[in-house]
Amino acid sequence: MLSLDLSFYNWELFTNYILKGLLFSVQLTVIATVGGIVVGTFLALMRLSGKPSLVYPATFYVNTMRSIPLVMVILWFFLLIPILIGRPIGADLSATITFIAFEAAFFSEIVRAGIQSVPKGQIYAGEALGMTYGQNMRLVVLPQAFRNMIPVFMTQTIILFQDTSLVYAIGAYDLLKGFEIAGKNYGRPIETYILAAATYFIICFSLSKAVRAIQAKVAIIR
């Protein structure tokens, strides 16, 4: 009969095994979110530019990334980047580059939808004031679009945090890896995986509640 014993879980286990992985997962999530939004914004602007030389490459990149499983992209970057630059870069840096490149495709779609949600009248008003395309986007469109996109950005960030567990494929020490090592060392793999699931649930559920609160505030502002 299966028996579960969670008494082994203590502060020492957390500091020795879990904390390091948690910090890396959070760091990877934050960097990938910021980097993904920056790159994704450029991709979205390229797709909305109307210039074939910009639209086609950006569309190809976004569609390709969105059509390939993340774990495959993680493995590709980990194996191919060292070959291209002639030296190893390590699992942590490889994971960071991969997540920025991968998430940029998803954030670009969010940004594109956000820009398109801004009333055309706002754009025409900017043009009537003599603004260039760049000024119109920077001063009129993007500020309104980003306010509308904040809840969706946060939702995608929650998904991103969950996806960081896939870096186990290249040996990076993330939150799940910390629980896995603790389970092996303490001889309690089942219990540690249960605790890992509970930890992910608590973090993601808390963030989802924050998203709902922000959505309500954005709706009130509108």
Which functions belong to the PLM regions below?
Residues 1-222:
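Transmembrane alpha-helices and adjacent helix-loop boundaries
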